[in-house]
Regions:
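Hydrophobic alpha-helical transmembrane bundles of multi-pass membrane proteins
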Residues: 2-365
Length: 365
């Protein structure tokens, strides 16, 4: 064998040896990495931390969406009222959130989630009493704060153009400190409406407990009833009734921003309702969130569509303002049972709410 052949054979052997060594070490490294990763992922503490992290992120994302409903309310209220009252309405919406956040943190959260059947115990500034079940207490406080602010904002729209700013501050204080926390304690806080023990009032009377998944009653109904009482006490807006006593429509100064406000509220409702799942880490959570998204959207569409149709038949042309309110009526109506009803049921609920809204406006006028 000549010198050139020996050299070539040597190089071939070296290349083969290097290839075998590379494959062997790569396989060992891959097995070690796989073993390490699977061990890390399979650790119960790691899985729990990951689950809590995902749930917390989803809860805070939903809280941001609900917070974004505040400009939606501001635009709707400003668009549906006269231009001279715009600054007053916008200031009230800022006050709702600023005062509401401080007061709910100071005392409202304790009254809502503290121990007690009728009302919780106030834990001034102290959040250590609450066990979030894996969710950070401070994050859950923020989530509940934006719901409290929503209840207060509803009152602003109903009493627009005839409420002194100073008196509206009193409303905000009572809603944030007492009314919303007490009604919330009866339900989400584990109070008497949620007491499923044998012999309890709900089980003895109805055979079941109260169900309000995302706040049709706790948030929207509370705000709505306060608004109705306030509007009844204050009376109609100036120019609402003529000398003959007949009701006159007071057109909003800018339906464009009112429509934009409804779109923002619709968008924010996808945090309001699905966010109440308070979890997003499992397949069951993902399915539940998806179902709530669907029922929420269908109810809104049905409410708006049938409000449009009925207003068209009654008045000879479709009404934009009634259609916008029909969408909101459908959203409010589905909020309690969005996790339980079928998609078809959501359409029925939205339809009823959209039609009922039109006749309710006529009745109140």
């Amino acid at each position: 064998m000549d010198k050139h052949s020996k050299c070539s054979l040597y190089r071939l052997r070296m290349a083969l040896a290097i290839s075998i060594a590379f494959c062997f070490t790569t396989d060992i490294f891959a097995q070690a990495t796989s073993t390490t990763d699977s061990t890390a992922i399979a650790t119960p503490d790691t899985v729990g931390e990951l689950t809590n992290g995902l749930n917390t992120v989803w809860m805070l994302l939903a809280a941001m969406l609900v917070f974004f409903m505040q400009p939606g309310f501001a635009l709707v209220e400003a668009g549906f009222t006269r231009v001279k009252n715009t600054a007053n309405i916008l200031m009230k919406n800022f006050v709702d959130f600023m005062f509401g956040s401080l007061l709910y943190w100071f005392i409202g959260f304790g009254l809502m989630f503290g121990a007690g059947g009728f009302i919780g115990m106030p834990h001034f500034f102290d959040l250590s009493f609450y066990d979030g079940g894996g969710l950070p207490t401070e994050g859950f406080l923020v989530f509940q704060t934006v719901f409290c602010a929503t209840a207060a904002t509803i009152v602003s729209g109903a009493m627009a153009e005839r409420t002194k700013f100073s008196m509206y501050l009193v409303y905000t204080i009572f809603i944030s400190v007492l009314i919303y926390p007490v009604s919330g304690h009866w339900t989400w806080g584990g109070g008497w409406l949620m007491n499923g023990e044998a012999g309890s009032f709900m089980m003895e009377t109805f055979g079941t407990t109260f169900h309000d998944f995302a706040g049709s009653t706790i948030v929207h109904s509370v705000g709505g009833w306060i608004a109705l009482v306030g509007a009844a006490i204050l009376g109609p807006r100036i120019g609402k009734y003529g000398k003959d006593g007949k009701s006159r429509a007071i057109p909003g100064h800018n339906l464009t921003i009112a429509a934009l406000g409804v779109f923002i509220l619709w968008f924010g409702w996808f945090g309001f309702n699905p966010g109440s799942q308070l979890a997003a880490a499992t397949t069951d959570d993902a399915r539940a969130i998806s179902h709530v998204f669907l029922t929420t959207n269908l109810a809104a569409c049905a409410g708006g569509f049938f409000a449009l149709a009925v207003s068209w038949m009654k008045y000879g042309k479709p009404s934009l303002s009634l259609t916008l309110n029909g969408i909101l009526a459908g959203l409010v109506g589905i909020t309690a049972g969005c996790d339980m009803v079928s998609p078809f049921g959501a359409v029925i609920i939205g339809t009823i709410c959209g039609i009922l809204m039109i006749y309710s406006v006529e009745f109140i006028d």
